[in-house]
Structures are given as structure tokens and as C-alpha cells.
């Protein structure tokens, strides 16, 4: 049991020493941060608009496409197609 405690203490001490050596840099090294600082406010606004997808290209949860019908079973989908075809014939 003493060996396990000694091993745990050694691991914790080594983790603290290695974490202190690595440290955090205060300089911004991220590419996206540098781009955001360089762009004027108006171009930043236009860039956000360009990134925003239109509602017809919106992907819902789990990557499923949103086609406006929601989640339907095959039976309901077949019923909807039958009703749609019936209405088309009546016209």
C-alpha cells in the first residue's frame, strides 16, 4: 500500500513540475484571432453575414436536413404522397 501512495505522490509532483515548465503564452498565436484583429468592423460584419446559412440549407440536430416536414415514418410519408396525388388529380 505504501508503494501505491509513493507512486501517486511521485506522479502528482512530476505533473506539477511539467505543468509549470509548459506554462501559457500571452501572445495570440491563433490564426483566427489574428484575422479578427486585422479586419475593420464593417468587413467583420459582412464576413458574419456571409457565413450564416440560409434557412433552406439549415441542418438540424444530428446532421439531418430540415425539409419542412419534420420527422415522419415511411407510412406517413406514403400517406402524404397519396393525398398529394389525389389533390392533383382533382384539379
Swiss-Prot record:
The modification Methionine amide is found at residue 62. This is Tachykinin-like peptide. GO terms for cellular component: extracellular region. Residues 64-91 are annotated as: Disordered. One of its GO terms (biological process) is tachykinin receptor signaling pathway. InterPro entries: Tachy_Neuro_lke_CS, Tachykinin_fam. Residues 76-91 have a biased composition (Basic and acidic residues). The keyword Hydrolase does not apply. Belongs to the tachykinin family. Keywords: Amidation, Amphibian defense peptide, Cleavage on pair of basic residues, Neuropeptide, Secreted, Signal. Residues 1-19 form the signal peptide. Tachykinins are active peptides which excite neurons, evoke behavioral responses, are potent vasodilators and secretagogues, and contract (directly or indirectly) many smooth muscles. In vitro, induces contraction of guinea pig ileum smooth muscle in a dose-dependent manner. It is found in: Secreted. It comes from the Eukaryota. Expressed by the skin glands. PROSITE patterns: TACHYKININ. It comes from Theloderma corticale. Residues 20-51, 66-91 form a propeptide.
Amino acid at each position: 500500500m505504501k508503494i501505491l501512495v509513493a507512486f501517486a505522490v511521485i506522479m502528482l509532483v512530476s505533473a506539477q513540475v511539467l505543468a509549470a515548465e509548459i506554462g501559457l503564452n500571452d501572445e495570440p498565436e491563433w490564426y483566427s484571432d489574428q484575422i479578427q484583429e486585422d479586419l475593420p468592423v464593417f468587413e467583420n460584419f459582412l464576413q458574419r453575414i456571409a457565413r450564416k446559412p440560409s434557412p433552406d440549407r439549415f441542418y438540424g440536430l444530428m446532421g439531418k436536413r430540415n425539409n419542412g416536414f419534420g420527422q415522419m415514418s415511411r407510412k406517413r410519408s406514403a400517406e402524404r404522397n397519396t393525398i398529394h396525388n389525389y389533390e392533383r388529380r382533382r384539379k
